[in-house]
From Swiss-Prot:
The name this protein goes by in its record: UPF0397 protein SPG_0438
Chief subcellular location: membrane
HAMAP family, alphabetized: UPF0397
Source species of the chain: Streptococcus pneumoniae serotype 19F (strain G54)
Organism superkingdom: Bacteria
Amino acid sequence: MEIKFTIKQVVAVGIGAALFVVIGMINIPTPVPNTSIQLQYAVQALLSIIFGPIIGLLVGLIGHAIKDSLVGYGLWWTWIIASGLFGLVVGLFRKYVRVINSVFDWKDILIFNLIQLLANALVWGVLAPLGDVVIYQEAAEKVFAQGIVAGIANGVSVAIAGTLLLLAYAGTQTRAGSLKKD
């Protein structure tokens, strides 16, 4: 199976990964060590909804890997993969959020936030910590605490910033049937 990307999709991955890195450098600390409030997941969620799961996956994988390599901690693959999976999961449900059709009402906001909260809970509360325990032999209590705090922090930041980004994006789209021939 051959996957072909359009120029628009390639640009979305490049810009999305770059934004992931730049915004990811802004760290708002939490009481849990090595865990901070991250705002880049709002942009990743936006791109996942607009361009779909593969673009969301690539933005998270590439962006997080570059960010980790720049900050000097080394590549932490379980969390890099979790970032990609967050974009994948959100993108899989994009058809339920109607921003492409210039619609992002309360129903869409509710659906988007339900999807992203469940995705955050899954990838940060379960998959990333489980990977840390299995692959890196990290202490389960520590990594699950980090994962739960990261999931909550990311869920709140995406609920606020992601919703605002999607509202702004929906406002730029032409509503189906709104154009009439004179």
